Amino acid sequence: MRAIKRIGFIFLLFATYSHAQIMVVSQNKVVFHKMKEYHELMEKHWNPIFDKLVDEGKLDEVGTLSHAWGDEWNIAGYYKAKDLASFEKAWNEGYEKFAESTPQNVRNKITSMIMEHKDSIYQLKHSHSRK
């Protein structure tokens, strides 16, 4: 009986998150004195790829948050998608294009600036914006 309940719970989670608008928040602890360079590299190599995915309707929105005062998670990227499956498809496409178009030494440099990283996937319960 426990196995059936567990399977039911997993199915409920899948059904809920696979059909609801989501926001993925990718938080980074970036070396403080490297933040400006990190943003410059991302603006050149990462952002145009994911902005294009929004323009093509594959993602709903992308953005970057940054602060120099507060907690240690000083740079975050966020991605809104109509559902988890759409996000995963767009993410895979975007990351593949990034890897193909960005020299390995630049990717290594970006990675070396990140001391720690974590991702969270949120189901949007309320969102209002003027478009």
Task: Describe the role of every protein-language-model region.
Residues 14-20:
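Sec/Tat signal peptide C-region and signal peptidase I cleavage site
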Residues 29-31, 69, 81-82:
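Short, flexible beta-strand-to-coil junctions
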Residues 69, 88, 125-131:
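A beta-strand edge to alpha-helix "cap/lid" segment located at domain peripheries
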Residues 2-10:
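Sec-dependent signal peptide recognition
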Residues 44-60, 78-125:
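An amphipathic, aromatic/His-enriched active-site/gating alpha helix that lines ligand/cofactor pockets
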Residues 21-40:
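Short N-terminal segments immediately surrounding and downstream of signal-peptide cleavage
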Residues 22-24, 73-75, 115:
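Residues that flank catalytic or metal-binding motifs in active/ligand-binding sites
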Residues 61-78:
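Acidic helix-start/capping segments at beta-turn-to-alpha-helix junctions
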